[in-house]
Amino acid sequence: MSLNIQNLTLNLGKKTILNNVSLHVKDGERVGLVGSSGSGKSMLLRAATGLLPFETKISGSCMLGGVQTVGASDENLARIRGKYVGVVFQQANRALNPMLSVEEQISLPLRIHYQLDADDVHNRVCAMLEKVGLPQNIISKRTFELSGGQLQRVGIATALITSPRLILADEPTTALDSVTQKDVVNMLTSLVDNMGASMLFVTHDFSVLSRAAKRCYVLDSGRLVDSAEVQDLLENPRVTSTKQLVDAAKKLTLRAQKLDSQNVSSENVTSENVTSESASSENVSSENASRKDSSLLTAKNIHVTLGRALARAEVLKGVDLDLFKGESLAIIGGSGSGKTTLIRAMLGLQKISDGIVTYDSQIVNSSTNRKKISDYSALRKETSLVFQHPFAALDPRWTVLKSVAEPLNIWRKSLQLDDATICNRVEEMLQLVGLNPKDFLERYPHELSGGQAQCVAIARALINNPRVLLADEPMSAIDVAERTRILDAFAAIRKERPTMSCIFVSHDLGMIQHLATRVIVLNDGKIVEFGRVSDVLNSPQNDYTRALVNAAIM
């Protein structure tokens, strides 16, 4: 099915979201749409399928095959959506219904558009799970039991279950590690090609785009400013906004210049061929031994087991970690490797089945006797956490001002802060992360793009001047141009507060080379490699680390 958009203009209140946009996707063609956060990419997809806010004013033409969607009734659009047009949404954790099992979620379009018996539906869901690389044993699980990569695959399966003729993919690899990104893009493009369908692939990541499409449009502030073959845009960007995106992508992407280790494909990497032997490093071990007295946050032999009695899984398997004063430490690993569980355990937010966590020499998490745990107030007051999914972390009823000010309001009595001081601090933090306070103070989360919401979450985490900052995928929803600005902000903060310790959980290897000095690689709940960032990225010793590095090379 073709997509033909002509002179599409979209206004939300007094703001123009899309301005005279025209693009086309031929039948059976894969086309990319790239642009910075807030450029209007997601709104373009919503306009194409009629999923716009009630107060939106739209003009122009959008043809899905031979059907005009601009001005079409909800009844007519409902016949198209899910049957002929499949949408892969940006954040699967928000797009999927937490009340439904995986089978119920994937089968929903089938049950809406076709009259099928239960056995036929079940068989089709099982076949689709196999196509997207998911095990059959997750069929009865719900969204909160799945990793980020699994959630995205479920979202793709839901979009493709009816074999639609057009796929609209909105940032389908956001917040996924490099290996999973590569696998998801390869899987999605293969399925689309096998179905003979068309696809419009929306992203801010040129390294992902080069695998997903051959031709590309560039959107900037609601206007189409460039279009060409993807390779041409990468090699010879003609427009300023395109050049900025390409330059930022190259800066934040690993290059193949120093990687002389053998090539290991992600398909050959399993937990069986990953051992902990590669985690030994005499240089780092001796250096750490001399710094034990400056350790601020320590985890010893951490084990975490999750799930019900008949389906329990060990998520962390004896992890040791030291965060030193003033240090920036990165934790990398594939989706489901245990990264988020580890930092939650270190903050006392996750019950551990074995081990001990100390903060400033005080026990804050223990498996043996929870009565021995010290007062949490120091830990909670002096640490901040940037959550992986900003929209899930922001209260939809609160303005940006109230959300960012929340940590100060909690401790305002001890900090002796009045409303005016708090408001000034909020404005300072918003400016630091690149958001104009005048434009954003009174906005609500649903009025923010993914990147803008992530910036708000980072501002909230930094506002109370924490001793320890733990950031779980802090830039997963931010385009490459915005990432450079956030990196500059982090650099300025570290220069201003040299004693602040940071843990950055990330799947983006290009980012951690700018954020951290030391790195830990997690796979299947175990540390498989650690050392200085430059050493690990340039000369990975473990098969799993090599796969992550090779998948991230642009």
Tell what function each PLM region has.
Residues R142-L146, Q150, Y444-L448, Q452:
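Conserved ABC ATPase signature
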Residues L209-R211, I512-H514:
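A short, surface-exposed alpha-helical micro-motif characterized by mixed small hydrophobic
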Residues K57-Q68, G355-S367, L379:
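Conserved ABC transporter NBD signature motif
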Residues T49, L347:
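Helix-to-loop junction immediately C-terminal to a conserved catalytic motif
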Residues I161-R165, I463-R467:
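A short, proline-enriched helix->beta-strand linker immediately N-terminal to the Walker B motif
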Residues T69-G86, E104, I112, D232-P237, ...:
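ABC ATPase NBD coupling module
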